[in-house]
Amino acid sequence: MKMRVRLLAVSGWLLGTAAAVLAQSPNPSVTADQARALFQNDVHQAAGLTCTACHDQAKGDQYAAPARAGIPKLCGSCHTNASYMKQFNPQLRVDQYPRYLTSTHGKQITKGELRVAVCSDCHGAHGILSVKDPRAPVYPTNVAKTCARCHADPARMTPFNKPATPPEEWSQSVHAKALLERNDTSAPTCSTCHGSHGAAPPDVENVALVCAQCHVREADLFRKSPKKKLFDSLAMPECVTCHSNHHIVEPQDSWLGFEGDIGCAKCHDDSIGGADVIKGDRKALDDLSAAIAAASDRLGRAERAGMIIDDGRAALREASDQRVLARVSMHAFAAQPLADDAAKGLKSAQLALADADAALAEVQYRRKGLAVATIFIAGFLVTLGLKIRRLNRGE
C-alpha cells in the first residue's frame, strides 16, 4: 500500500500547478510545519495522500527531501502509471516523464547537470494547485513568469550560453498583450511553442510548423509561394525572418513597401522586378483601410443622430473581415489573392458608406422638415398671439 501511495508523487505533472507562495524561489527549503500548512491546499492532499507519498521519514516527524536528480523519476513513478492515474481522472496524460527525458532539461539532468529545471521548479513541491487554478505557476497567464525565474536570469543562463532576454521580449509581443491584457488564454505563451514537459527550442526547419498550429492559412499560402524554395535554399526560418520569434509585434500594412528597414524593405528596394505588384497590393490595402475608416466615422455620426444603421454595420464588419483575409494573403507573395480579398472588402466598405450617407441624408431631410414645421408653428403662434391681443382690446 505504501508503495502505491508513494507512486503518486508530486501530482504537479498531472493537474499541473504549484503554490503561488513558492513562486519566489523554484524549490525553497521549508520546515515540516510550513510544508504541512502548504499541503492543506495541495491536489495530492485532496486525493488522500500524505507526506510519505514523496518523502522517506528520517527522524521523528522530519522527512528527507528527495534528491534533485531523482525528482522527475519520482514524479513519473505515478504519472506514468495509467491504471493508477485513471482513478483520479481517466483523461489525464501519463507521458510527462518520457517527454521530459526528451527535453533540453531532461537531457541535461540525465548527464548530472543539476542547474536545469525539474518538476518541482515549475509545479512547486507543496501546495500544488490545479492547472486550471489562476494562482498556479503553470496557469497560462503565469507560465511566462514561471519560465522567467530561470530564463530571465543572466546568472543562470550564461553558463549555458543562452540569452536571458526572451521573457522580456515576449512581454512586448502581440501574444503577451492578448494573453495578459485581454486574458485570452488561447494566446501562445512559452509552453505553446516550446512545449512544457518536452520543452526544447524548435529547430529552424520546424519553426513554421509550430506557427502553423495557429496560423494555418498563412502557413499554407507561404508553402505554395515562390518564397518557400528560396527560404529553404538559404536556410532561413520562414516566419521568424519577418516576424521575429519572441518579440513579435503587430504587423502593419506599411511592411508591404520599401520604407524603413522592416517587411519587404528588410531585403529589397523598389528596383526589384515585383516592385509594381508590391506597390499595387499596398495601394489596395490603403484604399480599403481608408474606406473602412470613412464608413466607420459616418456610420457613427448617423447612429449618434438616432438612425438605425444595421445594414451598414453588417457591411462594415464584412469589409473588416475581408481586410484581415487580405493581410493574411500577403503570405502568398503574389498579386492574388490579396487583390481579390481587398476588392471584396472595398465593395463592402462602399456599401457601408452608401448606407451611412443615406442615413445622414435622411437626418438632414428630417432636420429641414423640422425647421419648416418649427417656422410654421412659430408663425401660427405669433399670429394667434396678435389675434388674442386685439380681442382683448375690443378691436
Please place each PLM-identified region on the residue numbering.
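Bacterial N-terminal signal peptides that target proteins for export
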Residues: 1-14
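Short sequence/structural segments immediately N-terminal
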Residues: 22-383, 391-394
